[in-house]
């Protein structure tokens, strides 16, 4: 288990400074930070390689990338141009040697502002729109398979992800383990048991306090406080042989990246 940070700056020097301040040398880099994305709406493999080389010269390793978040329209088949650009970006990542991408495929469907018991998302398996969602996954997974890119799907719903895996089978169709799954009523400590370590391509570290059932009633707090036992989460990954990156995020008021990194490193070292 290695600790890294998210990076979204277009300035390699700034990213290197952020890494030094945090005490890490690995990042998951936003595709939007790569030169050319803003102009074209997608990245090329050459631009990914070049930016990665620039970061490497500054002692920073790009361990993975963060894919653009698709709109609801793109997922449901209503924006082919956006979907095509997303696929170009995924292909470029793999061609450039990126091993994994943090991917938020269904964020456009999450009820961020409303609470519907038993319905964390606007479209659930078997409902209208679900067939389109599966077609979307087939499309992006086929691209990932072509270039051997691991899709670390950021999906909190355990059973929903299993349904997607059953419909779109691929060793590259995996998951980001994020304790935010607690917001969906899932157990944030049992991801290894529920998904299998071979499917976990990337990890977040975050903690929350639940004040009520809706999304807005979960409070973000530093890693060493809250309802989630982060030590247990890290221990389960280490014991299962996870050989990847964990990135702290959503640290709440008073939380800092450098403190979170130090805390995670201490846990990894058995402290």
Question: Model-flagged regions — what are they?
Answer:
Residues 1-38, 42-44:
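N-terminal basic, low-complexity leaders that serve as flexible interaction/assembly modules and, when applicable
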Residues 2, 26, 61, 150, ...:
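Residues at the starts of beta-strands that form the adenosine-phosphate
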Residues 2-4, 9-20, 53-58, 73-76, ...:
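Histidine-acidic metal/acid-base catalytic patches
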Residues 30-134, 181:
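Structural motif corresponding to the early beta-alpha repeats
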Residues 103-108, 137, 154-157, 249-251:
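Short, well-ordered beta-to-alpha junction loops that form the rim of enzyme active sites
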Residues 123-131, 146-151, 220:
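Surface-exposed cleft-lining segments at the edges of enzyme active sites
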Residues 150-159, 163:
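Extended, basic/helix-rich recognition subdomains
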């Amino acid at each position: 288990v290695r600790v890294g940070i998210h990076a979204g700056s277009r300035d390699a020097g700034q990213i290197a400074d952020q890494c030094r301040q945090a005490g890490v040398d690995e990042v998951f880099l936003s595709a939007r930070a790569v030169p050319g994305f803003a102009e074209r709406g997608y990245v090329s493999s050459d631009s990914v390689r070049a930016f990665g080389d620039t970061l490497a010269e500054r002692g920073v390793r790009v361990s993975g990338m963060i894919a653009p978040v698709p709109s609801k329209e793109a997922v449901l088949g209503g924006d082919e141009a956006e979907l095509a650009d997303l696929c170009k970006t995924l292909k470029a990542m793999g061609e450039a040697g990126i091993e994994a991408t943090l991917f938020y495929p269904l964020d456009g469907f999450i009820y961020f502002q409303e609470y519907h018991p038993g319905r964390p998302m606007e479209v659930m398996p078997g409902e209208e729109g679900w067939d389109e969602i599966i077609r979307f996954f087939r499309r992006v997974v086929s691209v990932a398979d072509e270039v051997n890119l691991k899709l670390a799907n950021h999906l909190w719903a355990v059973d929903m992800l299993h349904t997607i895996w059953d419909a779109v089978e691929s060793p590259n169709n995996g998951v980001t383990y994020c304790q935010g799954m607690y917001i969906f009523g899932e157990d944030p400590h049992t991801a290894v048991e529920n998904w299998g370590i071979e499917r976990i391509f990337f990890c977040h570290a975050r903690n929350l306090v639940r004040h009520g059932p809706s999304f807005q009633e979960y409070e973000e707090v530093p890693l060493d406080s809250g309802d989630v036992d982060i030590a247990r989460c890290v221990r389960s990954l280490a014991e299962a042989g996870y050989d990847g990156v964990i990135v702290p995020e959503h640290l709440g008021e008073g939380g800092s990246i450098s403190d979170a990194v130090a805390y995670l490193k201490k846990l990894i070292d058995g402290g």
